[in-house]
């Protein structure tokens, strides 16, 4: 056992000596299980191979069937073609015959015509004769001539009769030919029907085959899908395998590194080992008598040393784990990159393959798509250009901001660089410290390992010393170290080992590996074994790698070949298509040429040209057809090749799938085995880890007990030294103790006796079980033999049944053939009858013709009687009459004969038809009966199949029974193991008995309990045996029922056989009666033929002779059939005899075995399921093999059981010997205790010395560890500080970057919104301008036409304009709602709208009042004032731009100087100063230009007013909606005034409010900016068409995100708008000027800082820039 374990684990034999026996036993079990699993794997592989072979055989059979069906189809087609050719030939032959007959008829008709001409001549002659009655002389001549003519007439009549007879004969021939033709047609119809039936059959066969093929294809597709799924699963497994292999490689590398480090450490500490060897020598000399104390102290020191692990191991482990994770992540990244590369390569390959064969249509579609894409790309390019231009403009405006951002980023980069440098320095220091720590830890670990190894060596030495002492003491006391019993047992073992039959290889292995003289030799052999195993493993891996490579190469080659073939086929196809297209184009071009040339050519040359063209077309068509034929042939060939290729590919795929499935199974098995090995290893490690702890615990317990005993001994010695007088009192106590000990020994012996009794009972149970198992096996073998015998009987019966069936089939075929022949004869008779009827009709027609001719002749004779003498005519006429009467009589007699024949034939036909009908009915009834019987038999077959399935279902039960036996054997093994454990426990009990009675009693109770468990197990086994017997009885009952069914089916079959025989006898009787009737009919026909000797009768006679011949042939056939029947009956009798014999044998076999009658039920199913029988045979063979294997296993198990029993007996002997030795040792202990006292003092001295040395070393190590800990803690603290600093810097940098990103995002969003608003406003402007232009044109036309138009028209126009105004108002409201951003803005809007409505109402009223006054006044000074306004506006704008630029620069400088918190008072002062300055400037400019600004409301002045309104730099954003509304009203009022032909001066002074915005710090100074304008204007949209001011536009009620401080608290907006709009009308001179002033609002932030005051909606005052000195902004900048 130990040898096997050491061989399996590749471990030296000595290392297993320290392991306990139960552990070894478990290991041995696991190894046995592993070997069994390997055997099962091999069996499974064999089964898989067998299944594969069966599958391939089935596929080959299916292919053969397909090939046979295709061959049958081809043969049927060939037969069809042959029959068609024969038909065509017969048709042509009959046509020729018909043509010949037609020619003969034509000749006969011409002869008839000649006869008629002669008759006419005769008639004319008679007429001439009647005319020349007076000429007697001539009469004589005429008489002579008449006689001559009569003779000629007679001759001609004879000729006519001959012609008629010829014609009749020809007609008969014709009729016969027609009949033959009809027969041929009928035969043709029959053949066609057969062909149609055959074609139907072929169609059905094709349908079935196609369905079968479809099913096969579906299966193929399923298999392909399964293959794909398996392939994907294999890929997944391969990837996992790769990952695992990588991890394994990494682990191997780590192991190698560890081994290298270990070797280095060994080399380093080899010197120290040499130093400590001296110490070991001293210990060996001193520790001869102190082995127990040494072992205890060594264990204690080992424990102390094991507790001295450093605290830094956790940190190092974490670092190692992180490194491993890093490596794993890198490997995963590389793997993913490789996968991505592979996928891209595959996609490129697919793209290249798909882009190989583009067609012309695809190219055209691609060109169209590319054109569209080009157009889209151009549009996108233009859009991008426009966007780029806009972006460049925006960049020009935002250059200062970008510069500031760059500076900030540079500063941040500098800070980041500093922080990274700091980090690098910190990381370098950290790495250095880590390296130092790792080196120190390695040193500490090395020291600990050395200490541990030294301790182990010390322990080993102590044990060796102990063994030496024991051996020396044994040698001193006795001559040999072993007892005689031990020597005898050793000899037995050696003899038994020699008895085993070994192979040559095994003998060599035992010689080289098992037998050894020294431990060194054993170690050397183990090393050799390891090297051999590693070499073999490397060879195996290399072989597997080569196999994988070769397989991959083969697969790649096949795939490449398939791809090349497909590409070639596609190229050929494409070439053919191009050729066809070229030919089609040529044909079309020729047709077009023909059509064009036909129109141009002349009428004479048209025909010739057409002919030439037609020839060309025909030639081209012929070429086309030939090319098509060639192409079709090529295509067919290619298709065939493709099909062949596909088939081969399918075959390859199937083989590949099978291989891959097998591969997958093998891999799964490998994985399972690996898992099992890992599990075993884990269990081994657990057990190994458990063993030292267990040993340690036992040693501690023993040490404690020893220490206690020592203490007691000391105390006793002390008491003995003090109290020698009390020894007498202790003597009785000693005697009592001895008595107790004797009692314990007796109890022990009793227990041993009971154990032996239990073992004997157990052995008896085993023997019973083995005998029962042997009986069962014998029964199984007998059953198998019966099965084989019955199968052979079955096969013989099947053959007999097949022969009977073949006979029956031949009889049925013969009956069908006879029926077909009779039917054919009936048809031929019917055709003959029809022919005869036609001949009778012809004869009747001829008789009628003759009657007519007789009448004519009578008439002629009467006429002649009148003219000629009666004497001359009477004799001739009488002769003729007599001849005619004779002919008539003959004709009548013939007719009567024919009628009699027809009647007799009709009667015979009717009788035959009746008989045929009866026979058909009988046959139909029989067929129906047979069908019913067939259905019944099929049902019986299905039932029998079900029973067969049940029997087959019983087979796995038998297998389960066998498995159950195996399980029981395993249970027995487990029980044996338990018994061994029991024995071990009993040994422990024997040792504990010496110490304490109580322990012995408890162990005795536990053994009793375990004995109870054994008895329970025995009871369970008996129950299992009873269950098996019950199952056997069940199977027997099922077999009995199956046998009864077989008997029933046999009875049915006998009854059916009797019915068939009766039917055969009745059929034979019917055929004999028919034969008698046929003979009677033939005799009748012969009588009629004797009476009538015509040609027709001769034909009939020939027909009947043919029929007789056929009758004779049929009779001969009948006789042969009877002979065959007799032969079949004999066979049947022999079969019945054999069946009776078989039944007798069956009854005997039933009596003997009663289990093998079920299989006889398969005698009907074998014709259809021969293949299944073969499969069953194979399965049975496999089962027999498995049974044999199981029996062999059982035998092996029994052998092992016997071995174990022998081992148990040997162990029991050993137990007895050990007990004896224990008793000897107990005596020796007393001697050793006295020696112990002497050794104690020496040992204590040595231990003190060692302790002192070890204490010094320990103190040094502890000091070093504390120093290292201090360093580590300081380094960790420094690391933590640096990490905190770095995290802070990171956070600051990230916050700043996030803030800048948010600002940029906000700016971009605002820009996009403003652009959208700008686009909308521009669209509205264009729309309104278009409306204005339309209105102007309408007004001009109206001025020319409607000077004398009344005011009613003006009112209508006014209404329409008012409606338009209302619509525009609604649009304004929509626009306002869209631009509404906050609640404050909405309130402002509401106020503005109310004020706007009020102003509009007031102005409309004023306008209506002043309209009448201003109608008669003219508009003279328009141009002058417009020019002055434009020049003033431009100058003022330039000045304002210069001032704003200067102030922006000043504001930037002030901002650079002052970035700290400004107060609110300072902001208010700045706002008030700015307001005052703007108001003063506005007043000055108004005063300067007050005298010159008096002009009328026209287009130019309106536009100037608009521009001034919108170009005013200090106008607030909140006022703009009202300005827009005013502008729209103004535009709508202009055409009203022009309609009324206003020629007076109208002037309006617009005083618009100034609104200050608290957010943007914009001072509204529109009143200062606006000059006194004589027109009524409310302003312009947000931006003019010239400027793009939306780029810098900001909503005044939304805080700009460039200076938002997220940390600072939000301030409230105190908006106090005060709007005051005043209007004044000046007629000639402006006298009153209004100044609008607005209160300023508190502003917290400024939005954008653009350079142009026109483009921006905010003020560009430098004082306002100082608002950036807010505390919130300052805090943000500092952060």
From Swiss-Prot:
Signal peptide: none annotated. Gene3D superfamilies: 1.10.287.1490. GO terms for biological process: mRNA export from nucleus; negative regulation of protein import into nucleus during spindle assembly checkpoint; nucleocytoplasmic transport; poly(A)+ mRNA export from nucleus; post-transcriptional tethering of RNA polymerase II gene DNA at nuclear periphery; protein import into nucleus; regulation of DNA-templated transcription; spindle pole body organization. One of its GO terms (cellular component) is mitochondrion. Residues 32-176, 233-466, 516-1064, 1099-1491 form a coiled coil. One of its GO terms (molecular function) is ribonucleoprotein complex binding. It is found in: Nucleus; Cytoplasm, Cytoskeleton, Microtubule organizing center, Spindle pole body; Nucleus, Nuclear pore complex. Residues 1495-1521, 1632-1679 are annotated as: Disordered. A motif (Bipartite nuclear localization signal 3) lies at residues 1433-1449. A motif (Bipartite nuclear localization signal 1) lies at residues 417-433. A motif (Bipartite nuclear localization signal 2) lies at residues 639-655. Keywords: Coiled coil, Cytoplasm, Cytoskeleton, mRNA transport, Nuclear pore complex, Nucleus, Phosphoprotein, Protein transport, Translocation, Transport. The keyword Cytoplasm applies. Residues 1511-1520, 1646-1661 have a biased composition (Polar residues). Its main location: nucleus. Residues 1662-1671 have a biased composition (Basic and acidic residues). The modification Phosphoserine is found at residues 1512, 1670. Component of the nuclear complex (NPC). NPC constitutes the exclusive means of nucleocytoplasmic transport. NPCs allow the passive diffusion of ions and small molecules and the active, nuclear transport receptor-mediated bidirectional transport of macromolecules such as proteins, RNAs, ribonucleoparticles (RNPs), and ribosomal subunits across the nuclear envelope. Due to its 8-fold rotational symmetry, all subunits are present with 8 copies or multiples thereof. Interacts with NUP60 and NIC96, which tether it to the nuclear pore complex. Together with the closely related MLP1, involved in the structural and functional organization of perinuclear chromatin. MLP1/MLP2 associate with the nuclear pore complex and form filamentous structures along the nuclear periphery. Has a role in the localization of Esc1 to nucleolar regions. Together with MLP1, mediates tethering of the some telomeres to the nuclear periphery, probably mediated by YKU70/YKU80 (HDF1/HDF2) heterodimer and show perinuclear location dependent silencing. MLP1 and MLP2 are involved in telomere length regulation but not silencing or telomere anchoring. PANTHER family: NUCLEOPROTEIN TPR, NUCLEOPROTEIN TPR-RELATED. Present with 2770 molecules/cell in log phase SD medium. This is Protein MLP2.
């Amino acid at each position: 056992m130990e040898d096997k374990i050491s061989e399996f684990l590749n471990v030296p034999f000595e290392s297993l000596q320290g392991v306990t026996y139960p552990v070894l036993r478990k290991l041995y079990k696991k190894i046995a299980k592993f070997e069994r699993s390997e055997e099962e794997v091999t069996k499974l592989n064999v089964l898989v191979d067998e299944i594969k072979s069966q599958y391939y055989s089935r596929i080959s059979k299916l292919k053969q069937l397909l090939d046979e069906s295709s061959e049958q189809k081809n043969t049927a087609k060939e037969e069809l073609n042959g029959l068609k050719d024969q038909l065509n030939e017969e048709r042509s032959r009959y046509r020729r015959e018909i043509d010949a007959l037609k020619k003969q008829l034509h000749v006969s008709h011409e002869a008839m015509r000649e006869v008629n001409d002669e008759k006419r001549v005769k008639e004319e002659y008679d007429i001439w004769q009647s005319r020349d009655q007076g000429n007697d002389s001539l009469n004589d001549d005429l008489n002579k001539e008449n006689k001559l003519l009569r003779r000629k007439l007679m001759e001609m009549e004879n000729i006519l009769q001959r012609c008629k007879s010829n014609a009749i004969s020809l007609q008969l021939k014709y009729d016969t030919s027609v009949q033959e033709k009809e027969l041929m047609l009928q035969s043709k119809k029959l053949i066609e029907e057969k062909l149609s039936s055959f074609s139907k059959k072929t169609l059905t066969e094709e349908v079935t085959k196609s369905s079968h093929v479809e099913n096969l294809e579906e299966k193929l597709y399923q298999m392909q899908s399964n293959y794909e799924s398996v392939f994907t699963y294999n890929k997944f497994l391969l990837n996992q395998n790769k990952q695992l292999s990588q991890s394994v490689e990494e682990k191997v590398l780590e192991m190698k590194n560890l081994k290298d480090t270990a070797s280095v450490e060994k080399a380093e500490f080899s010197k120290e080992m040499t130093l400590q060897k001296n110490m070991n020598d001293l210990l060996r000399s001193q520790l001869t008598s102190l082995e127990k104390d040494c072992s205890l102290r060594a264990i204690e020191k080992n424990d102390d040393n094991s507790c001295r692990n450093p605290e830094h191991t956790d940190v190092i482990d974490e670092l190692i784990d992180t490194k491993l994770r890093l490596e794993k992540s890198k490997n995963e990244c590389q793997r993913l990159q490789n996968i991505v590369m592979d996928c891209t390569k595959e996609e490129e390959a697919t793209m290249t393959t798909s882009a190989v064969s583009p067609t012309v249509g695809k190219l055209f579609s691609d060109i169209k798509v590319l054109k569209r894409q080009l157009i889209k790309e151009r549009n996108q390019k233009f859009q991008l250009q426009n966007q780029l231009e806009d972006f460049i403009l925006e960049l020009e405006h935002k250059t200062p901001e970008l510069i500031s951002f760059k500076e900030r980023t540079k500063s941040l980069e500098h800070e980041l660089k500093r922080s990274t440098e700091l980090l690098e320095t910190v990381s370098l220091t950290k790495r250095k410290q880590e390296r130092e720590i790792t080196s120190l830890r390695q040193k500490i670990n090395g020291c600990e390992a050395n200490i541990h190894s030294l301790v182990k060596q010390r322990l080993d030495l102590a044990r060796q010393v102990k063994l030496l002492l024991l051996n020396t003491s044994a040698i001193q006391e006795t001559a040999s170290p072993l007892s005689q019993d031990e020597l005898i047992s050793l000899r037995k073992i050696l003899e038994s080992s020699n008895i085993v039959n070994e192979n040559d290889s095994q003998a060599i292995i035992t010689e080289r590996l098992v037998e050894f003289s020294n431990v060194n030799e054993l170690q050397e052999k183990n090393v050799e074994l390891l090297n051999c195993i590693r070499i073999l493993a490397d060879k195996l891996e290399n072989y597997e790698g080569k196999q994988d490579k070769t397989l991959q190469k083969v697969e790649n080659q096949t795939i490449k070949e398939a791809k090349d073939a497909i590409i070639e086929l596609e190229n050929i196809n494409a070439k053919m298509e191009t050729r066809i297209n070229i030919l089609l184009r040529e044909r079309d071009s020729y047709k077009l040429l023909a059509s064009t040339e036909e129109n141009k050519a002349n009428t004479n040359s048209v025909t010739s040209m057409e002919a030439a063209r037609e020839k060309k077309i025909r030639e081209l068509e012929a070429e086309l057809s030939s090319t098509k034929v060639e192409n079709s042939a090529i295509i067919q060939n290619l298709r065939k090749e493709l099909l062949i290729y596909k088939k081969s590919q399918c075959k390859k795929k199937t083989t590949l799938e099978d291989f891959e499935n097998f591969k997958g199974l093998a891999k799964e098995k490998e994985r399972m085995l690996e898992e099992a090995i890992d599990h075993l290893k884990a269990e081994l490690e657990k057990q190994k880890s458990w063993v030292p702890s267990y040993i340690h615990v036992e040693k501690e317990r023993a040490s404690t007990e020893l220490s206690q005993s020592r203490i007691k001994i000391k105390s006793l010695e002390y008491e003995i030294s003090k109290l020698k007088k009390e020894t007498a009192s202790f003597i009785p106590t000693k005697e009592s103790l001895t008595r107790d000990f004797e009692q314990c020994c007796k109890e022990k012996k009793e227990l041993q006796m009971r154990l032996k009794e239990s073992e004997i009972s157990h052995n008896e149970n085993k023997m019973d079980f083995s005998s029962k198992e042997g009986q069962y096996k014998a029964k199984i073998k007998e059953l198998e033999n019966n099965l084989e015998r019955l199968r052979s009987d079955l096969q013989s019966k099947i053959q007999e049944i097949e022969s009977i069936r073949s006979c029956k089939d031949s009889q049925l075929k013969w009956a069908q053939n006879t029926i077909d022949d009779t039917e054919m004869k009936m048809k031929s008779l019917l055709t003959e009858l029809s022919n005869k009827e036609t001949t009778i009709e012809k004869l009747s027609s001829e008789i009628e013709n003759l009657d007519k001719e007789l009448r004519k002749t009578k008439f002629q004779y009467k006429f002649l009687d009148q003219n000629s003498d009666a004497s001359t005519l009477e004799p001739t006429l009488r002769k003729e009459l007599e001849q005619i009467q004779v002919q008539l009589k003959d004709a009548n007699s013939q007719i009567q004969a024919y009628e009699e024949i027809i009647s007799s034939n009709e009667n015979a036909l009717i009788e035959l038809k009746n008989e045929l009908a009866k026979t058909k009915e009988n046959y139909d009834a029989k067929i129906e009966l047979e069908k019913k019987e067939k259905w019944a038999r099929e049902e019986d077959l299905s039932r029998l199949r079900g029973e067969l399935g049940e029997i087959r279902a019983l087979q796995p039960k038998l297998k389960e029974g066998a498995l159950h036996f195996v399980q029981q054997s395993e249970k027995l093994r487990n029980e044996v193991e338990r018994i061994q454990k029991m024995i071990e426990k009993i040994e422990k009990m024997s040792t504990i008995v010496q110490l304490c009675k109580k322990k012995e009693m408890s162990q005795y109770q536990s053994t009793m309990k375990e004995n109870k468990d054994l008895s329970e197990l025995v009871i369970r086994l008996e129950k299992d045996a009873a269950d098996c017997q019950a199952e056997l009885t069940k199977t027997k009952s099922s077999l009995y029922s199956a046998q009864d069914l077989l008997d029933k089916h046999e009875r049915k079959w006998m009854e059916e056989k009797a019915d068939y025989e009766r039917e055969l006898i009745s059929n034979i009787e019917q055929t004999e009666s028919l034969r008698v009737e046929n003979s009677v009919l033939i005799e009748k026909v012969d009588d009629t033929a004797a009476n009538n000797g015509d040609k027709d009768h001769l034909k009939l006679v020939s027909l009947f002779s043919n029929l007789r011949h056929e009758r004779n042939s049929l009779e001969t056939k009948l006789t042969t059939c009877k002979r065959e029947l007799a032969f079949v009956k004999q066979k049947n009798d022999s079969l019945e005899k054999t069946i009776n014999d078989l039944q007798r044998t069956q009854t005997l076999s039933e009596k003997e075995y009663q289990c093998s009658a079920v299989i006889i039920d398969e005698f009907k199913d074998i014709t259809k399921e021969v293949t299944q029988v073969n499969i069953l045979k194979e399965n049975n063979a496999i089962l027999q093999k498995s049974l044999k294997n199981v029996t062999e296993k059982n035998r092996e198990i029994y052998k092992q059981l016997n071995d174990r029993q022998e081992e148990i007996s040997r162990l029991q002997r050993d137990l007895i010997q050990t007990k004896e030795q224990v008793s000897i040792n107990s005596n020796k202990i007393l001697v050793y205790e006295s020696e112990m006292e002497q050794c104690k003092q020496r040992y204590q001295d040595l231990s003190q010395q060692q302790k002192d040395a070890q204490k010094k070393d320990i103190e040094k190590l502890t000091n070093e560890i504390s120093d290292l800990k201090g360093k580590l803690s300081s380094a960790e603290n420094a690391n933590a500080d640096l990490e905190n600093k770095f995290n802070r810097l990171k956070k600051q940098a990230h916050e700043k970057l996030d803030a800048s990103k948010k600002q940029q995002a906000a700016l971009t969003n605002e820009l996009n919104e403003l652009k959208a608003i700008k686009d909308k406003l521009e669209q509205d402007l264009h729309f309104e301008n278009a409306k204005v232009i339309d209105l102007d044109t309408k007004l001009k036309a109206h001025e020319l036409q409607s000077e004398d138009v009344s005011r009613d028209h003006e009112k209508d126009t006014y209404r329409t304009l008012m409606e338009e105004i209302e619509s525009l108002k609604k649009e304004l409201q929509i626009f306002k709602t869209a631009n509404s951003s906050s609640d404050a803005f909405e309130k402002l809007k509401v106020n503005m709208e109310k004020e706007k409505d009020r102003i509009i109402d007031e102005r409309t009223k004023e306008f209506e009042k002043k309209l009448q006054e201003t109608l008669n006044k003219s508009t003279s000074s328009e141009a002058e004032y417009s020019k002055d306004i434009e020049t003033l506006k431009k100058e003022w704008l330039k000045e304002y731009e210069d001032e704003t630029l200067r102030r922006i620069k000043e504001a930037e400088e002030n901002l650079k100087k002052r970035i700290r918190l400004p107060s609110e008072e300072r902001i208010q002062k700045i706002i008030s100063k700015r307001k005052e300055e703007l108001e003063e400037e506005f007043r000055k400019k108004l005063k300067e230009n007050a005298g010159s600004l008096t002009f009328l409301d026209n287009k130019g002045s309106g536009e100037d007013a608009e521009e001034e309104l919108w170009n005013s730099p200090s106008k607030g954003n909140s006022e703009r909606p009202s300005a827009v509304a005013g502008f729209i009203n103004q535009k709508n009022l202009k055409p009203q005034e022009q309609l009324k032909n206003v020629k007076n001066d109208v002037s309006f002074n617009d005083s618009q409010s100034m609104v200050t915005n608290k957010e943007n710090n914009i001072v509204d100074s529109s009143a200062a900016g606006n000059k006194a304008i004589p027109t009524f204007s409310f302003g312009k949209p947000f931006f003019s068409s010239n400027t793009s001011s939306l780029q810098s536009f900001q909503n005044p009620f939304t805080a700009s995100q460039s200076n938002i401080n997220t940390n600072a608290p939000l301030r409230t907006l105190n908006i106090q708008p005060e709007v005051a709009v005043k209007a004044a009308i000046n007629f000639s001179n402006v006298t009153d000027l209004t100044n609008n002033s607005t209160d300023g609002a508190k502003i917290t932030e400024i939005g954008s800082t653009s350079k142009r005051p026109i483009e921006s909606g905010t003020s560009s005052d430098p004082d306002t820039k100082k608002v950036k000195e807010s505390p919130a902004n300052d805090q943000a900048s500092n952060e």
